[in-house]
Amino acid sequence: MTVLFILSAGLVAVFGYLVSWFIYCRTLHPLSKVPGPFWPSVTRLWLTYAVSRGELDVVQRDLHRRYGPLVRIAPDEIACADPEAIRKIYSTTSPLNKSDFYHIWDVGAFSKYPNAFAIVDENMHFERRRIVSSVYSMSTVLTLEPYIDNCSRLFVKRMTERTVPHEAIDLGDWFLWYAYDVIGELFFGHSLGFIENRGDEGGFLASLEVMLPVLTIAAASSPLVRGLIMGLFTLSSTARKGLKGMNHIIETARASVDKRASAVAEPGKGERKDLLHNLLNIVSSKGDKLDFGIEDVKNEAFAALTAGADATMIELQAIFYYLVKDRSVYEELRKEVDQAVETGKLSEFPSYSEVVQLPLLKATIKEALRLHPAVGFTMPRVVGQAGIELLGMYIPPGWKVGMNAAVVGRDEGVYGTDANTFRPERWIERTDSDMDRCNNLVFGAGTRTCIGKQIALSEIYKMVPLLIRKFDFALVDPSKSWTTHDYFFNKQSGVQVKVTVRGL
């Protein structure tokens, strides 16, 4: 009887707590007036589940269609789809701190400082980023074009050798190999060998594929259960494979930087002027003053290895997917590229300064990035002490707000009623600052714009016309669509194409 009474009392207490919590979240909570479904307003498990399915971009677009530009996606978090809010949430003058979503991404453990992506405090981020910002500027990236071209030449050579008219290839694989080999050229003084070997022989890339969904699900979860999620994951054989691969990546970054630092210290050596050289230059010239040492360079190298290639791969794949789906745009772009080559305006391996003069090329790249940004996630920020007003609604300090480029990029008020359609001409027909501002969200916005943005854009702009000129791409089955997997990076699969050499 006593046991039964205790169990009954416990159930009543739990039920009473849940009812009280539900009433509070729905009626008294500072975010209770923000529209949205019931479950996100009372538990973060709804968001965790949505993330675990790998389709948060699709879910959020549907939520905003149903509930409007402000939607509550967790008891303490709002997703905003109002283009005007970009300036407020991702301000360059009064930036908001990142939320605890980013804590879990501080992996690598080289420096006493987190990697730039995982730093949540804006003051610390400002101090650390300004140390290396010049290294990643477009003016510096343009000096690195010969190293990017090394990978492009090998890409064309290996694809030409491999291509059989009726043999399909996975474009995503090839673009990922290319992007990682460029990272190798820029950070480690040599290609990582993916294009040369036409594969992931060491399981390097596979380990990242294993880790990304788990880290993303844990990051989106309540801090109270993140440890549990990661703990359960580490018990699996899949986890051991992923962690082994991650340790290999850590050691690759460590060994490569140490080897290069030793070479630079020797007279007559270290003449290769790549990105790693520029970072080591900071260490030798003002490292003590800036508290920036070899371990911080390893942080940069590790960040490049774990996140520096995905955006390039995703966007290159998106561009060619939309082109082979819409042959009319493909043919027009090929005419533009061919004409530029024939009139001497475009080199065989184009420079960035040449390709940005091609209007349809620029429009095509912008349009593909708009429709399928590399990151399909809300980038949450914590409202500061002054609070913030969004669409006439005051959001008090301490709550989380964010925007998803995969939602904002399809805003019909900005891009028109055909916002879900691939139509590059929209970028040529009119000049609109709102269009560019929304599209800039693809690489983040404000003070937290992706530091590798210029590297990615340089690779993309140079590679697209090169491949358009050298090859012809066609979908194996034009009736099929790709499959996307939105675990922070919104990766695609199933883009099988036939490739033929044009012979020009």
From Swiss-Prot:
Knockout consequences: Impairs the production of griseofulvin, but accumulates the intermediates griseophenone C, monochlorinated griseophenone G and dichlorinated griseophenone G.
Record: residues binding heme: 450
Record key words, sorted: Glycoprotein, Heme, Iron, Metal-binding, Monooxygenase, Oxidoreductase, Signal
InterPro entries: Cyt_P450, Cyt_P450_CS, Cyt_P450_E_grp-I, Cyt_P450_sf, Cytochrome_P450_monoxygenase
Biotechnology comment: Griseofulvin is a spirocyclic fungal natural product used in treatment of fungal dermatophytes.
Cofactor(s), by name: heme
Gene3D superfamilies: Cytochrome P450
Any GO BP annotation: terpenoid biosynthetic process
Pfam families (UniProt xref): p450 (PF00067)
EC number: 1.-.-.-
Transmembrane segments: none
Family: Belongs to the cytochrome P450 family.
Role according to the record: Cytochrome P450 monooxygenase; part of the gene cluster that mediates the biosynthesis of griseofulvin, an important antifungal drug that has been in use for a long time for treating dermatophyte infections. The first step of the pathway is the formation of the heptaketide backbone by gsfA which is initiated by priming with acetyl-CoA, followed by sequential condensations of 6 malonyl-CoA units. The resulting benzophenone can undergo a spontaneous dehydration to form norlichexanthone.
Protein name per Swiss-Prot or TrEMBL: Cytochrome P450 monooxygenase gsfF
Lineage of the organism: Eukaryota, Fungi, Dikarya, Ascomycota, Pezizomycotina
